[in-house]
Amino acid sequence: MTELKAKGPRAPHVAGGPPSPEVGSPLLCRPAAGPFEGSQTSDTLPEVSAIPISLDGLLFPRLCQGQDLPDEKTQDQQSLSDVEGAYSRAEATRGTGGSSSRPPGKDSGLLDSVLDTLLAPSGPGQSQPSPPACEVTSSWCLFGPELPEDPPAAPATQRVLSPLMSRSGGKTGDSSGTAAAHKVLPRGLSPSRQLLLPASGSPHWSGAPVKPSPQPTAVEVEEEDGSGSEDSAGPLLKGKPRVPGGAAAGGGAAAVPPGAAAGGVGLVPKEDSRFSAPRVALVEQDAPMAPGRSPLATTMMDFIHVPIVPLNHALLAARTRQLLEDESYDGGAGAASAFAPPQSSPSASSTPVAVGDFPDCAYPPDAEPKDNAYPLYGDFQPPALKIKEEEEGAEASARSPGSYLVAGANPAAFPDYPLGPPPQLPPRAPPSRPGEAAVTAAPASASVSSASSPGSTLECILYKAEGAPPQQGQFAPPPCKAPGAGGCLLPRDGLPSTSASAAAAGAAPALYPALGLNGLPQLGYQAAVLKESLQQVYPPYLNYLRPDSEASQSPQYSFESLPQKICLICGDEASGCHYGVLTCGSCKVFFKRAMEGQHNYLCAGRNDCIVDKIRRKNCPACRLRKCCQAGMVLGGRKFKKFNKVRVMRALDAVALPQPVGIPNESQVLSQRFTFSPGQDIQLIPPLIKLLMSIEPDVIYAGHDNSKPDTSSSLLTSLNQLGERQLLSVVKWSKSLPGFRNLHIDDQITLIQYSWMSLMVFGLGWRSYKHVSGQMLYFAPDLILNEQRMKESSFYSLCLTMWQIPQEFVKLQVSQEEFLCMKVLLLLNTIPLEGLRSQTQFEEMRSSYIRELIKAIGLRQKGVVPSSQRFYQLTKLLDNLHDLVKQLHLYCLNTFIQSRALSVEFPEMMSEVIAAQLPKILAGMVKPLLFHKK
């Protein structure tokens, strides 16, 4: 690159050029440009002294001087078009394709006036009047009327500019001495992160003197082969000056970037070659056609926009850190609020920052307050996460600098109004991914060339708003976690940037909820999100997240509505319904073994042991008792197969209600006998009441007690009583449930075989019931005490019959037990060949055995006592066979010797004795015993 010297008093200004950096001076302010008050006409750079530690007094407002520069504007328009042509031709030499559209400028003369001030020689030989500040964008003058000249400052300035302009010779300076001053941000740094530096000591509010700071312009350094700029630039980004948007000669005010209007240097990332080639060719073609301009303005037309302020980089670093760590940022917010860009403008946060010797620290975005400036919007992101590095591409050139201004507005048309307090900002919206092309909602006259490069970003979305989505804007909060949720998951280089396309559409997804005054999500939102998430996992728990008004409408759940699946014996988990009861497998096996093994369990306690899952094996007696009380029957499942109607019809068509009471443990003993499969009739207490109702009335013997007892008269009275009782048995048997279902021959046979047993058993009951077993109560008119028994001829037989009431007294037999035992006596003797209706007989007998067990359970509580009583009662029934046998023998002998003994036998009784007693005594009958002898 050839050596460049400033020959003309003016330098072209490219409208829309992004800001360029100056090493050590990344200061930004409102987009207002003002020339140097004291123009210097020297070929060399101005020599100014270093800025003091404090910035107070450096920036102050300047009144307008009312100067007019019409000739400068005309000359600037012509020179600017020439320079743009040369710049386009120079870009074409890079050999890459692509094109970019540039909007025509609106007021190129005004821009040239600013460039004239920038490139005006500072020597005493040349002097050009500078336009007043009122004819440019603002009436604020950046510096005082006279800047003190400091000779040592010139070499430093030259060292800064020499690598940028590729100057050779002694003006290049020592690059090693300014290595720290050449530090810039990485290539991928977002052009949106400018540093807001308010004037120290005075907030930008209405009525207060405002001292805006200069903003840096855009500088892009492009790498060129064979040039000395690569060695002298140090860590600067290598690039070539470019023009994002040029101003045509048609007139009109071109959009001015903040850096171009306010001063300073900014860094623009390297532009893609496919978009910059036509511009370089245009500049190279028009470069020779720019008379009256300095070589610096011709070649580096986009390099410098406003005067370079040689500020102390150490001061800037200290001031930058102070601004980043300061709690109050009202000055920067006020300065940013003057020209706040539209909410849909993505380029509001797209101005780059050049850092001198700053570390990789965070920079607030352009026109964005500090974290605590607007706490209502809940910006939880720390400053270290507010910087965004983007990939190299054409994003910088795609952003139009006109987006910083109101649409259709001229930056020179803004009058000098005092800055008011910052306006209320819209809620923050999430930015887009880095590397994504930004389509700017700029004025209609400025078209933007966009280039999107694919980039992936990890977005941390932790909240999902249910209401309307927040409005997109430059104050979008970074997607970070809420307070207390830990650090943000996004890396520094993966933070998303504002998406212009989403902002222009205005329909971006709402990713942030409404926040409270403390920056935290409202409780109603948290409950709604929690309730929404619970609908997918745990729906019954939605009642815990409901308003108070819905609390009374929520369904109430209780244990009654849940299915019972526990063992009724021990409380363990039930495996099914075993033997008619819902039990576990352990209790099922225990009950089966206890019933089949005929174990005689005894409780070591008081028959009230606790039977649960842990202690169920401690007391088998109490466990078996509980099984019987629950209703477990060994043949319970087998009995369900038979039809109830058929069995009821078998029981003499007497309707028996189904058992509903709690079964007792006496059912254990019923399984020790051979049951028929048709035993579906379970005799229950109502059946016992039926037996009580069919009990025969009191039968009188017709004995004359006024006469002394003789053997013949006493026996004759007993025979008459027997005849009446036999008729009563026939009548009772016909009313007995199930008996008439048997064959008629079977009915007669059973009555003939059991009539003696029934009469003696009734005698014992009456004796036990009326005289407590002290006498033989044959009838109310025939009661034999011991004295009368001794005087009789059948005293031995009376002693035999007297045993029955004594057993009743001993066992304290109840009426229910007596009624059941009486029925079993009717069914305890059958012929050897069996009965014609043997099956129905067995079913009927088994049913009454179970009824006896129930009758025992009405008084005996516990398995062991019930079993013992069942044994005693059934043993008594077995013993009656021998006793009745003695009566049969005595009756048959008396019947045979009736004439000799002068004893009368009634007709029916005579037929029964003559027909059946010889068979019974001959052993031609089969007694049914409960116990083996």
Curated annotation (Swiss-Prot):
<keyword id="KW-0862">Zinc</keyword>
<feature type="compositionally biased region" description="Low complexity">
    <location>
        <begin position="335"/>
        <end position="350"/>
    </location>
</feature>
<feature type="modified residue" description="Phosphoserine">
    <location>
        <position position="190"/>
    </location>
</feature>
<feature type="cross-link" description="Glycyl lysine isopeptide (Lys-Gly) (interchain with G-Cter in SUMO); alternate">
    <location>
        <position position="388"/>
    </location>
</feature>
<feature type="modified residue" description="Phosphoserine">
    <location>
        <position position="81"/>
    </location>
</feature>
<feature type="region of interest" description="AF2; mediates transcriptional activation">
    <location>
        <begin position="687"/>
        <end position="933"/>
    </location>
</feature>
<keyword id="KW-0754">Steroid-binding</keyword>
<dbReference type="Pfam" id="PF02161">
    <property type="entry name" value="Prog_receptor"/>
</dbReference>
<feature type="zinc finger region" description="NR C4-type">
    <location>
        <begin position="567"/>
        <end position="587"/>
    </location>
</feature>
<feature type="modified residue" description="Phosphoserine">
    <location>
        <position position="676"/>
    </location>
</feature>
<feature type="modified residue" description="Phosphoserine">
    <location>
        <position position="162"/>
    </location>
</feature>
<keyword id="KW-0479">Metal-binding</keyword>
<dbReference type="InterPro" id="IPR035500">
    <property type="entry name" value="NHR-like_dom_sf"/>
</dbReference>
<feature type="cross-link" description="Glycyl lysine isopeptide (Lys-Gly) (interchain with G-Cter in SUMO)">
    <location>
        <position position="531"/>
    </location>
</feature>
<feature type="modified residue" description="Phosphoserine">
    <location>
        <position position="130"/>
    </location>
</feature>
<comment type="similarity">
    <text>Belongs to the nuclear hormone receptor family.</text>
</comment>
<feature type="cross-link" description="Glycyl lysine isopeptide (Lys-Gly) (interchain with G-Cter in ubiquitin); alternate">
    <location>
        <position position="388"/>
    </location>
</feature>
<feature type="modified residue" description="Phosphoserine">
    <location>
        <position position="20"/>
    </location>
</feature>
<feature type="domain" description="NR LBD">
    <location>
        <begin position="679"/>
        <end position="913"/>
    </location>
</feature>
<feature type="compositionally biased region" description="Pro residues">
    <location>
        <begin position="418"/>
        <end position="433"/>
    </location>
</feature>
<feature type="zinc finger region" description="NR C4-type">
    <location>
        <begin position="603"/>
        <end position="627"/>
    </location>
</feature>
<comment type="subunit">
    <text>Interacts with SMARD1 and UNC45A. Interacts with CUEDC2; the interaction promotes ubiquitination, decreases sumoylation, and represses transcriptional activity. Interacts with PIAS3; the interaction promotes sumoylation of PR in a hormone-dependent manner, inhibits DNA-binding, and alters nuclear export. Interacts with SP1; the interaction requires ligand-induced phosphorylation on Ser-345 by ERK1/2-MAPK. Interacts with PRMT2. Interacts with NCOA2 and NCOA1. Interacts with KLF9. Interacts with GTF2B.</text>
</comment>
<dbReference type="GO" id="GO:0003707">
    <property type="term" value="F:nuclear steroid receptor activity"/>
</dbReference>
<dbReference type="InterPro" id="IPR001628">
    <property type="entry name" value="Znf_hrmn_rcpt"/>
</dbReference>
<feature type="region of interest" description="AF3; mediates transcriptional activation">
    <location>
        <begin position="1"/>
        <end position="164"/>
    </location>
</feature>
<keyword id="KW-0963">Cytoplasm</keyword>
<dbReference type="InterPro" id="IPR000128">
    <property type="entry name" value="Progest_rcpt"/>
</dbReference>
<dbReference type="Pfam" id="PF00105">
    <property type="entry name" value="zf-C4"/>
</dbReference>
<feature type="region of interest" description="Mediates transcriptional transrepression">
    <location>
        <begin position="165"/>
        <end position="305"/>
    </location>
</feature>
<dbReference type="GO" id="GO:0005737">
    <property type="term" value="C:cytoplasm"/>
</dbReference>
<keyword id="KW-1017">Isopeptide bond</keyword>
<keyword id="KW-0863">Zinc-finger</keyword>
<comment type="function">
    <text>The steroid hormones and their receptors are involved in the regulation of eukaryotic gene expression and affect cellular proliferation and differentiation in target tissues. Transcriptional activator of several progesteron-dependent promoters in a variety of cell types. Involved in activation of SRC-dependent MAPK signaling on hormone stimulation.</text>
</comment>
<keyword id="KW-0446">Lipid-binding</keyword>
<keyword id="KW-0805">Transcription regulation</keyword>
<feature type="region of interest" description="AF1; mediates transcriptional activation">
    <location>
        <begin position="456"/>
        <end position="546"/>
    </location>
</feature>
<dbReference type="InterPro" id="IPR001723">
    <property type="entry name" value="Nuclear_hrmn_rcpt"/>
</dbReference>
<feature type="modified residue" description="Phosphoserine">
    <location>
        <position position="213"/>
    </location>
</feature>
<feature type="region of interest" description="Modulating, Pro-Rich">
    <location>
        <begin position="1"/>
        <end position="566"/>
    </location>
</feature>
<dbReference type="InterPro" id="IPR000536">
    <property type="entry name" value="Nucl_hrmn_rcpt_lig-bd"/>
</dbReference>
<keyword id="KW-0449">Lipoprotein</keyword>
<dbReference type="GO" id="GO:0043565">
    <property type="term" value="F:sequence-specific DNA binding"/>
</dbReference>
